Curated annotation (Swiss-Prot):
Its EC number is 4.1.1.130. GO terms for cellular component: extrinsic component of mitochondrial inner membrane. Residues 1-40 form a transit peptide. InterPro entries: Coq4, Coq4_euk. It is found in: Mitochondrion inner membrane. Its cofactor is Zn(2+). It comes from the Eukaryota. Zn(2+) binds at residues 169-170, 173, 185. GO terms for biological process: ubiquinone biosynthetic process. This is Ubiquinone biosynthesis protein coq4, mitochondrial. Belongs to the COQ4 family.
Length: 287
């Protein structure tokens, strides 16, 4: 057959419709997703990512959070991008293996100022979990309504687990008494890493390079040893149903969970400031 003949046959073949059986076969075998394609959302607000996008999000958000540890949105994105494929499933399985954890997964409670009104929490007994939580929120000037919604985790149930961890974070602060400035956050993140194994909490420790030398020395000599003891020795905090123990004595809860309360970071910093002030005054008088 000549070249012209082959071209003519090809044109005719393209113009002829496919048999119905062939069309059905093609329709029943859709093209598989590649690392460059993006799957469909699996729940409201879900932003599915392909492998390349997830890797870029993990690296970009981690670097951005290191440059500015106060960027909660970058920390949240890094947490979601690095939690799969293993770590968030491990946390979900820990909840499934615990009676209280299973109840939380069934009920799916949310922690907001609507579900836990601050006036009610402030009215609870002095040393209760709820009153301690409210006092910590008031002292630090933060709100439970500022947590970002999870959107980069593909499994819908695991997305809730990450959301639950995120919303319980302030309860961890309240029970340990750690403040929200960088030194306090790093101490708590070290504790959370050893308790939850979420990679972002461990990666946060790189932000220690931004601390002042005295703060870094204090973190490594006082608070990291505490984080190791309490993080490894405590129960899975993701399985605590905080909403049901608001009236419980907070010291009793610490004993049950195996959490040792760390030295008061704000008090230590206050004492150091006063000591420096007295030293300056002494030197000034000596002149």
């Amino acid at each position: 057959m000549s070249i012209l003949g082959r071209r003519g046959a090809a044109i005719v073949a393209r113009e002829l419709p496919l048999p119905a059986s062939s069309s059905s076969i093609l329709a029943s075998h859709p093209r598989a997703f590649s690392i460059f394609s993006r799957p469909q959302p699996k729940y409201p607000g879900h932003v599915p990512l392909n492998a390349i996008e997830r890797g870029a999000l993990a690296v970009g958000s981690a670097v951005g959070a290191l440059m500015n540890p106060r960027r909660a949105d970058l920390i949240a994105a890094c947490g979601e991008a690095t939690a799969t494929p293993y770590f968030i499933y491990r946390l979900r399985d820990a909840m499934l293996s615990d009676p209280t954890g299973r109840q939380i997964l069934r009920d799916r409670p949310r922690i907001t100022s609507t579900t836990l009104p601050l006036p009610y929490l402030r009215s609870l007994p002095e040393n209760s979990v709820g009153r301690t939580y409210a006092a910590w929120l008031d002292r630090e000037g933060v709100s439970p309504d500022t947590r970002d919604e999870v959107k980069y985790i593909d499994d819908e149930e695991c997305a809730y687990v990450m959301q639950r961890y995120r919303e319980c974070h302030d309860f961890y602060h309240a029970v340990t008494g750690l403040p929200i400035f960088v030194e306090g956050e790093l101490a708590l993140k070290a504790f959370e890493f050893l308790n939850t194994l979420i990679p972002m909490t461990g990666l946060s420790m790189f932000a220690a390079v931004r601390l002042k030398p005295a703060e870094r020395e204090r973190l490594f000599s006082i608070y990291l040893p505490w984080a190791v003891r309490s993080g490894l020795g405590s129960k899975e905090l993701i399985c605590v149903y905080w909403e049901k123990i608001l009236e419980k004595d907070v010291n009793e809860l610490r004993r049950e969970l195996g959490i040792e309360r760390p030295p008061d970071m704000r008090e230590i910093r206050r004492m150091i400031r006063e000591q420096k002030k007295r030293e300056k005054e002494r030197l000034k008088q000596a002149e």
